[in-house]
C-alpha cells in the first residue's frame, strides 16, 4: 500500500513512506476514499497522541514470558470483588512468574461468555470496577478483549437501530436482497441473518455468531471512530495489549 497514497491524493501532512502514519493513511484512503480517509486519519492520529501521553513506556518482550488467561470471576472469596481477589492472588503467588494477565471480557454481556457486549465502557458490577482493573495494571501487563465484529442486541446502539435513532441506526450490517450463502462455512449452526422489526419495517441483519450478536458495519466511518475511542479508553484504564475479537 505504500505506493497507494500518491496515486489517490496528496496527503494533507507529509509522511515518510514506510512510516506507520503513512501506512495508516494509505489503508484509510483505500477503505473510505480520499477525503474521508484523510479526515479519519487526522481524528485517529489526534486520539492516539492524546492517549500516548498517559501511557507507560513500551518494553521489549520475548518468548520466555508467560501470560495468564482467565475470566474476571475465576477466583472468588466470600463477598469480595473477584477482580480484587484476582489481583491479590496474582501479586502473592504469580509475581515474577508471569508478566501479564489476559482477562476475558469483563463487560456487561447478554450471552456467549461475555462476547455479546452490552456496554463496552463498563465493568460488570458483580466483578468489580475500573479501579480494580487499574490496580491490576500497576503490577502486570493487562490484555483486554475488544469485541469489534458484533455487539449484543441489548446494546443501546441496537436500540438506536430498531428505533431509527442516531448514532446506532447506521451501525449494523443489513442484508440486501437474497445473496447465496451456501458457501459460507463457520463453526456455528445459527442463521447468518436475523429478521428484526424496526420503525422502518422488517429488516434482516447479519448475525454471524448468534441471533444475540449483531454484526457491526465498519463501512460507516463513525463505527471505526467509536471503536477507536473505546480502544484508547481501555489503554487509559490500564490495558497494555488489546486482543481484537472475531477478526
Language model segments and positions:
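Hydrophobic residues within beta-strands of alpha/beta enzymes
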Residues: 101, 242-244
Amino acid at each position: 500500500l505504500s505506493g497507494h497514497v500518491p496515486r489517490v491524493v496528496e496527503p494533507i501532512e507529509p509522511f515518510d513512506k514506510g512510516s506507520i502514519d503513512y501506512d495508516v493513511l494509505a489503508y484509510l484512503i483505500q477503505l473510505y476514499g480520499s477525503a474521508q480517509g484523510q479526515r479519519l486519519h487526522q481524528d485517529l492520529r489526534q486520539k492516539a497522541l492524546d492517549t500516548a501521553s498517559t501511557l507507560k513506556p513500551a518494553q521489549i518482550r520475548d518468548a520466555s514470558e508467560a501470560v495468564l488467561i482467565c475470566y474476571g470471576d475465576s477466583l472468588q472469596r466470600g463477598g469480595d470483588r473477584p477482580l480484587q481477589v484476582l489481583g491479590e492472588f496474582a501479586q502473592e503467588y504469580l509475581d515474577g512468574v508471569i508478566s501479564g494477565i489476559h482477562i476475558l471480557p469483563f463487560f456487561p454481556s447478554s450471552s456467549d461468555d461475555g462476547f455479546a457486549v452490552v456496554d463496552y465502557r463498563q465493568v460488570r458490577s458483580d466483578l468489580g470496577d475500573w479501579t480494580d482493573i487499574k490496580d491490576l495494571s500497576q503490577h502486570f501487563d493487562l490484555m483486554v478483549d475488544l469485541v469489534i465484529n458484533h455487539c449484543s442486541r441489548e446494546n443501546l446502539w441496537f436500540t438506536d437501530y430498531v428505533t431509527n435513532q442516531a448514532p446506532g441506526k447506521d451501525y449494523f450490517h443489513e442484508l440486501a436482497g437474497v445473496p447465496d450463502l451456501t458457501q459460507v462455512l463457520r463453526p456455528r449452526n445459527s442463521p447468518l441473518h436475523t429478521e428484526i422489526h424496526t420503525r422502518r419495517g422488517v429488516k434482516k441483519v447479519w448475525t454471524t455468531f448468534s441471533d444475540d450478536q449483531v454484526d457491526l458495519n465498519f463501512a460507516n466511518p463513525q463505527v471505526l471512530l467509536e471503536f477507536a475511542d473505546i480502544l484508547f479508553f481501555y489503554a487509559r484504564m490500564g490495558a497494555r495489549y488489546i486482543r481484537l475479537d472475531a477478526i
